[in-house]
UniProtKB/Swiss-Prot annotation:
Entry's localization field: Cell inner membrane
Annotated transmembrane regions: 8-28, 41-61, 73-93, 94-114, 133-153, 157-177, 208-228, 235-255, 274-294, 295-315, 325-345, 349-369
Record's protein name: Uncharacterized MFS-type transporter YE1530
PROSITE patterns associated with the record: MFS (PS50850)
Family per similarity comment: Belongs to the major facilitator superfamily. YcaD (TC 2.A.1.26) family.
Keyword presence, Disulfide bond: no
Membrane topology: Multi-pass membrane protein
Source organism per UniProt: Yersinia enterocolitica serotype O:8 / biotype 1B (strain NCTC 13174 / 8081)
């Protein structure tokens, strides 16, 4: 029996439309704020507000799914995102956009947890890997499509918000024709997340997810601003962001295969080293396209390899708790990365974006080069 049943395909179609909307806004929001002459640190704070919403959404998703089920939770999350998107048209100021992007972040995290949980529930032990692989491919495909759209449509706020909101509402339609059952909360044992964060054997994976969050959060939130300050148009920024994400898609399969064959520790070391090389190449004003390509290949594949490292350290009954802990770790990194980096960029130079990325990557590389039994982390028990 195929893993891609009719409900699964409909769910992935909805996710594709939703992800296109996310990608468009994640690129244009910092550009719109920059056009309004807001300082760089405020642009970074708005990006961090979105990731704060991601963290809150991750924490409340389980209870919402238990109370409402997959379908209703999905529809309400889409409505919340559409409302938060329309709110951007009311006024372009720091405080209101801080709130609207927070609610958008909550909605996005809810959608991610809902889709992932529904796919895992509908799959079996033998095909869950295929389902999650399809999930990642659809997510990145939607991200690239959103970036490419910026080159063919108007990027003015009042032009973009209506069709993006309509796209989100359209993303609700596929799940009107599919149903995902959810067990009662009494059938699901309580899962503690904090002990997973303290697990010594998984510390490299947990730290890797934090570093991945810092890296990708900074790139998503501040790279459009960096490119805009280099004199690029909004359409050009979209093309460069599409190249970055496309390289992440290309790198998924071969890097995953290498991690299975040669070991995740070796591959993590190579990935982090390549991230440092890509950052140095951009700082040195070398060819931007190859530098962004290798940065995307290594950076966008860091999270799944680190996640696999951590998940192989726990038993099957603890996988859900570990996955939730890793997503929280990634979100914390995504929250702190743009905040710290934007403050440094505002005070010193836009080049601090890639200096920061190279710096945190170097710290993680030093951890990876130590023997596993010598690792220390702020989360791991000592």
């Amino acid at each position: 029996m195929s893993a891609y049943s009719r409900p699964v395909l409909l769910l992935l179609c909805g996710l594709l439309l939703f992800t296109i909307s996310i990608a468009v806004l994640n690129t244009l929001v910092p550009l719109w704020l920059s056009h309004q002459q807001l300082p760089t640190w405020q642009v970074g704070m708005v990006s961090s507000s979105y990731f704060s919403g991601n963290l809150v959404g991750t924490l409340i998703a389980g209870r919402i799914i238990q109370q409402l089920g997959f379908n209703r939770s999905y529809h309400y999350s889409c409505i919340l995102f559409a409302l938060a998107t329309c709110g951007l048209m009311l006024s372009v100021d720091f405080w209101s956009w801080l709130g609207w992007r927070f609610f958008a972040g909550v909605a996005c995290a809810l959608i991610w947890v809902i889709v992932e949980s529904a796919l895992l529930r509908s799959g079996t032990v033998t095909n869950r890997g295929q389902l999650l692989a399809a999930y990642m491919m659809v997510y990145y495909l939607g991200t690239v499509t959103g970036q490419l759209l910026l080159g063919v449509v108007s990027t003015q706020l009042l032009s973009v918000i209506p069709w993006v909101s309509a796209l989100v509402i359209t993303a609700m339609l596929p799940l009107l024709f599919a149903h995902f059952s959810h067990q009662d909360s009494g059938d699901v044992p309580h899962i503690a997340v904090w002990p997973m964060l303290k697990r010594r054997s998984a510390r490299l994976g947990i730290n890797g997810c934090i570093i991945s969050g810092v890296l990708l959060g900074s790139l998503y939130g501040l790279l459009p601003l960096y490119l805009s300050h280099q004199g690029m148009s909004d359409a050009s920024v979209g093309w460069w962001m599409a190249l970055l994400v496309s390289s992440g898609i290309i790198g998924q399969w071969p890097i995953g295969k290498m991690a299975d064959r040669y070991g995740r520790l070796l591959v993590l070391r190579i990935q982090v080293f390549v991230v440092i090389l890509g950052s140095i190449a951009i700082l040195g004003n070398y060819a931007l396209a190859p530098a962004l390509f290798i940065l995307g290949c290594a950076g966008f594949t860091l999270y799944p390899v680190a996640m696999a490292w951590a998940c192989e350290k726990v038993s099957a009954d603890k996988l859900v708790a570990m996955n939730q802990a890793l997503l929280m770790s990634y979100t914390i990194g995504s929250l702190t990365g743009p905040t710290m980096t934007s403050l440094l960029m505002q005070r010193y130079s836009d080049n601090l974006l890639f200096i920061m990325i190279a710096g945190v990557a170097l710290v993680y590389l030093m951890m990876l080069l130590r023997k596993p039994d010598q690792q220390k982390t702020p989360f791991a028990a000592v």
